[in-house]
Amino acid sequence: MRHWLAGLMLLIAPSAFAQQAVPNIAFDSVPNPLKLPPNMYFGEVSGVSVNSKGHVFALSRGNTSGPAYAAAATQLLEFDAKGAFVREIGKNLYAWSFGHTVKIDPQDNIWVTDKGSDMVIKFDPEGRVVMVFGRKQEASDEDTAPLKHPKPPLPAEDGRFRQVTDVAWDKAGNTFISDGYINSRVAKVDKDGNWLKSWGDRGKEPGQFNTPHSIATDANGNVYVADRGNHRIQVFDGDGKFLRQFTIDIPVPPGAKPAIGKIPDEAMMAGGTFFPGSPWSLCITPPPNQVLYSSDAWPGRIYKLSLDGKVLGILGQSGKQLKQFGWIHAMACPSENVLYVAELLNWRVQKLLLKP
């Protein structure tokens, strides 16, 4: 019996010790980090990014001149390094429909993905449109209608997106686009906007996706994809060769409450979106010592990981107070211990100062 118990302990100990070894990271949330002008309000904040000057860009679905899921809901807002409002970029832009993410490239160009219009827009640092990808559907288009997609979906096409989600870059200036809710693939275009290739389709195998929802690159040009519906992160080289995948498997703490609705049951979690640890957003810190941050909707945490997928720490929980989260949709990590998080349900951006 004694030997049997010893063997049992050897089997369960690594898992138990691994769970105990994941620390909770202490952190603060800066009150009111982004200061809007009077009579301007955030709606759902779906994107956040930071440029080389420390200016913060927030993508909000707060424009009330149109329906919640139609033209003009998107607003792209810029704040200086102290959080003071600078300007709105792209007001009344043709592509605006249902903004998904905003990202700043190494040259401080501003990129926005719009899920509703199926478009990616590149602005220069002054806020002028310099490149567009995809095409917005119009009422005159054959076999389709505005803001709708046929079922079953049409075959994926080069240069056309269907509910596109995010962008990232490598050192050569190539852009990687996660596309998205329908096409379930990653696209690659060069610095001049020429379509190079795409990889992936809908499925569960390595190299397949179920809602590639966020994308990031490391200093070596590897591409990290938040495969949200399959509750995993997949890693590829810059040509789309599958390298590895990993999942975040940290138990939900007792007493955890969802940000909205009931606690997800097995059927709800089976869809992937609300599976604990399922990645909604990714960001990778600058070199030389890069780490990966990922967020989930349930139980509403942020995870700090090494680039090979080891969970180094966790922080936060669902809720409405500072240091709590309501569906983090995007993150920016200008340094290892400073995070900006964009929340859908709480209509805000939080600035987090980590104290590991």
Placement of each model-derived feature along the sequence:
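Eukaryotic scaffold repeat domains enriched in small/polar residues
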Residues: Q19-P356
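N-terminal signal peptide c-region/cleavage motif recognized by signal peptidases
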Residues: A13-P14
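Bacterial N-terminal signal peptides that target proteins for export
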Residues: M1-A6
